[in-house]
From Swiss-Prot:
This is 2-phospho-L-lactate transferase. One of its GO terms (molecular function) is magnesium ion binding. 7,8-didemethyl-8-hydroxy-5-deazariboflavin binds at residues 50, 89. Belongs to the CofD family. Homodimer. It is an enzyme of class 2 (transferase). Pfam families: CofD. The keyword Transit peptide does not apply. It catalyses: (2S)-lactyl-2-diphospho-5'-guanosine + 7,8-didemethyl-8-hydroxy-5-deazariboflavin = oxidized coenzyme F420-0 + GMP + H(+). It comes from Methanococcus maripaludis (strain DSM 14266 / JCM 13030 / NBRC 101832 / S2 / LL). PANTHER family: 2-PHOSPHO-L-LACTATE TRANSFERASE. Catalyzes the transfer of the 2-phospholactate moiety from (2S)-lactyl-2-diphospho-5'-guanosine to 7,8-didemethyl-8-hydroxy-5-deazariboflavin (FO) with the formation of oxidized coenzyme F420-0 and GMP. GO terms for biological process: F420-0 metabolic process. Its cofactor is Mg(2+).
Amino acid sequence: MKITILSGGTGTPKLIQGFKEILPNEDISVIVNTGEDTYIGDIYLSPDIDTVLYTFSNLINDETWYGLKGDTFFCHEQLKNFGFDEVLRIGDKDRALKMHKTSLLKKGVPMSEIVDIERKSLSINSKIYPMSDEKIESKVLIEENNEKILLKFHDFWVSRRGNAKVLDIFYENSNYAKAADGVLKAIEESDFVIIGPSNPITSIGPILSISEIKDALKEKLVFAVSPIVGENPVSGPAGTLMHAKGYPVNAVGVYEYYKDIVDVLVLDNSDINKKKEMNCEVLYANTIMKTIDDKITLARNILDYYKSR
């Protein structure tokens, strides 16, 4: 059995940890958001890609879901001494991966090739794909002092810590972007696809904004795991961003956002009263993944539901 997972950098990696314990890793493919990619100084950051790489290689700092567990920050601190204060702390070992990407990108190597080199270097048997080899940027339109300002998502969430009135979200350059090499084949060869519990607007939305990916998903059985429990996102700014796009911050809003492609919506047990408002199948489970057992159980629940259909 082969599956493909759509992932951002938080939420979904927990589910990936569950699936990689119950399926042969070579049968798992992951398509990852790159809409938050940016430069800090001369270093190229692809945060969601790196988080997925570290998740599969059991290196992820699972307290922050960013960077490597046990990393040191000598370079970051030394740069501060020279007057260069990085807005994001980059660990020393993590910096090596980012320098590798930066070097190859400057040589014109496509991101999909770079990620494939890195996954092999980290002894990862699963396939990991950026959503596109083309540059797509998630932009957040905010209002500040009666002025409209368009920010990169990284600037909105990291530099400003999400403290702004959000008016809208855009995916710059997505209208003409193509899926990265291998993405459409991974979807086609999968028995089913899982949209993980990442932020729908800025983690999954950029992937779906690529028309050929969305069209391919319409031909497959698609599960979507809600990142909202009750009226609260499990983590991150999903609530603020869903509200800005006109969706209610609850399970119904998640359904409305995914309704063109979702066949089975996976909701937390506490949202059992929401099914009547959705025109799709609903699987209830514990979607709050605090332990490895929680992660494995949710993955197994999805797998068992698929087998029982």
